[in-house]
Amino acid sequence: MIRNDLRNVAIIAHVDHGKTTLVDQMLRQSGTFRENQVVEERVMDSNALERERGITILAKNTSVHYHGVKINIIDTPGHADFGGEVERVLKMVNGVLLLVDAAEGPMPQTRFVMQKALELNHKLIIVVNKVDRPDARIAEVQDEILELLIDLNASDEQLDSPIVFCSGRAGTASRYADKEGKDLTPLFDTILNHIPPMQVDETAPLQILVSSIDYNDYVGRIGIGRIERGMAKANQEVSVCNHNAVGQVKRGKLVNLYQIEGLARVPAETATAGDIVCFSGLEGINIGDTVCAPDKVEAVPFVKISEPTVEMTFSVNDSPFAGKEGKFVTSRHLRERLYRELLKDVSLKVEDTDTAEAFKVSGRGEMHLSILIETMRREGYEFQVSTPRVLYKTVDGQLYEPIERLIVDVPEEGTGAVFQSMGERKGELVHMSAVGSRMRLEFLIPARGLFGYKSEFLTQTKGEGVMNSIFFEYQPYKGDLKRRDTGSLVAFESGEAVTYGLYNAQDRGVLFIDPGTQVYEGMVVGVSPKTEDINVNVCKKKHMTNTRAAGSDDAMRLNSPKKMSLEECLEFLNDDELLEVTPVSLRIRKRILDSELRAKARAREKKA
């Protein structure tokens, strides 16, 4: 049977090319909201972190109705670090809308998600978005998309994919580049005409592939997936199996069944093959599991998610300020929370270490792990993390390391400094082109060469540069790299930082703290331009004497301290440092707090 009343599509694109904004307009124009309903911008980015950063982290489902056809739309993350979300979501759909910015053109993540969609042989609709940008290069971008498709070995049919020209913010679409649209009708029509209806078998035994997981305090874990065949009913007895665990079958019951209407989950009594459904009642259900009829247990093969490339150590906070600011501080709390994250995030890995206090957490990139750290911090957790490390592989006795494909867009005058930095970081230029008045440079660079480069890059390009990277492949180890050219200013006394102590310390470098900040021995309070660390006493008070020289007691002027975000702190960390994370503060500290013990450890290292 062919389901003409249904289409399942995913929207894929590079970060910030306007996916979530376009979905907003599709919801508005299809009558999902009441006329008098107040709806915030980027309504799909419901998580607080997503709204703050303007990025999508979790793939989300919604649906619209157009000419009697229900279109299920899945908004996916555009950042490479959340690629695991994109890979598994593509299993739920039959076609994809590939969004490309009319000025920026295809970017690294565009290539990655497109490759995954082509591998699954999905139908493609190319959407050139933001055509109303003053710097739009519509004709060139069309050529770049075609080149990319050829590069990815697309079939003739995929090369002939329709192109729609949109402005997500204005809510207009047109099939012609030189003709302005009035609304999104051309886009909806293209979806109905080009994305094929599903061929389904409603009478066959039930089979649902779980592609996403949600959690609710009232009903527990909620599985989300597409019904591959058959019909699902609320309170139905089912079996759960997995393609990778042959012979392990669990029995259970679909207690609640929901369908997605607009942004809401609506309870449903039944759903048929092709529908994307949410269900609760199956404890321990996981991504990649297959829910099927008890009399026909058959697992659906699940897409292999790309391996993590970066790891960090999360450990219990053992600084002198431990337990003062956090709600959850013990190793039991930390372990429970990290393993709970695995239930939702397929591209994360957590391993126990030799001690009960520390855990190895691996992810797809620095941003992937920093989002987890920030989320835990907001939930009231207190812990400390090590510097990010890349995951090496040994192939035939030779060490291999992850290589990233880095694309930078910089003003012409900034290229010299970028080339110099890339040379120092073992980057290799593979492509260079002019894009308007700017230069686009493409490098292959070891992943560890990018650690700490973001802030340096923004300084080099006076804040005008844009850099994006994505995992390329594993290659033989490229040799040693220096992590940082600067040293740290380290407090050698515990207490409260005072103006007099900070005034004397600021001659040695740039400070991170204000007067009145509580510090402890071994805490990093600033950055030194020299390569070695310098111990400073920021708690030193000016002692009273009975002699005063005229004019010598002028008010001391302190420079503004450098305030660092979580990502900047992680970039700054050296191998002998840790970042203490609490709901209130971020403090960088030395692994060994005592200055004498630190000096002895350094001497031992030099000898070795």
Q: Language-model segments: what does each one mean?
A:
Residues 1-608:
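Structural and coupling elements of P-loop NTPases
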